[in-house]
Amino acid sequence: EGCGVTAIETAGGAVVGVVTERGTIRTRRVICAAGATSFRLLDGVGIRLPQQAVRGTCMRTNVLPDVSASTIWGHGLGIRQRRNGTINLADDMQVDVDLTLGHLRGLSLFWPQFWSQREKFRLRLNAAALRDVCARIGGAAGPIEPRDPQPQPNRAHAPRALAKLKAIFPALKDAQIVEAWGGLIDVLPDGIPVIDAPGTPSGLAIATGFCGHGFAMGPIVGRLLAEWVDTGEPSLDLSAFRARRFVDGTMVRPRSML
């Protein structure tokens, strides 16, 4: 804990260890599940992954009358009422893209989906671009810096989300936004993750690019990866989640992404 991994070490086409801030750990098995920074570790072993990150904003209201115990998404709003009566909400899946030079990676694969849903993205040129340039010039340790980015929410979403909530549920006329927070979502061009043991280098397994659905998929993916590492074969066919789909032309463009 608190020790960053900077590289996956290989020899003779096989994993032999991971390089960390505190030295090298020898191992013949590595699961790369480093979220939005997985592409950096994989790049070091010759696997090019067109992975990006977008910044989402969520909000929480004051305590309100009961609406529903279910998660609701529609009419440009997603909501979930908590047991204490407050409501978590987000505005129509709109996300911010903090532009950096890294966004050139996989651009041709992302572009069709971006253009077809461009109203859901807000392109931002801000301090993230400067930090990216400085890191590239100074040779900063990209996989572990910043260690805890704490992305800021886009508070411009709050009044829109609140107005939609009151329009959908007129009984919630006293609703107010009391908290907002931001988070990074790692994304891949087709909206589905990479869950793979590519074979080169041997001993490597990958689980990344969950596009905001990792919390729900975590238990089954963890079980399948454990099977893969233990027996060499998962109990389900995971061929659709291969990392090579982005380079061998088998990636299927999605009609929509949620």
Model-derived segments and spans:
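A conserved beta-strand/loop element that lines the FAD pocket in flavoprotein oxidoreductases
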Residues: 1-5
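Flavin-dependent oxidoreductases
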Residues: 8-133, 144-155, 159-168, 172-173, ...
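Short, flexible coil/turn micro-motifs enriched in small/turn-prone residues
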Residues: 12, 17, 30, 80, ...
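Substrate-binding strand-loop-helix patch
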Residues: 25, 186, 216-217
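Acidic, glycine-rich active-site loops and adjacent beta-strand->loop/helix elements
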Residues: 57, 65, 182, 242-248
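Short, basic/glycine-rich phosphate-binding loops at helix/coil junctions
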Residues: 137-143
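A glycine-rich dinucleotide-binding beta-alpha-beta segment and adjacent secondary-structure elements
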Residues: 153, 157-212, 248-251
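C-terminal lid/capping helical subdomain adjacent to the catalytic/cofactor pocket in oxidative enzymes
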Residues: 190-258
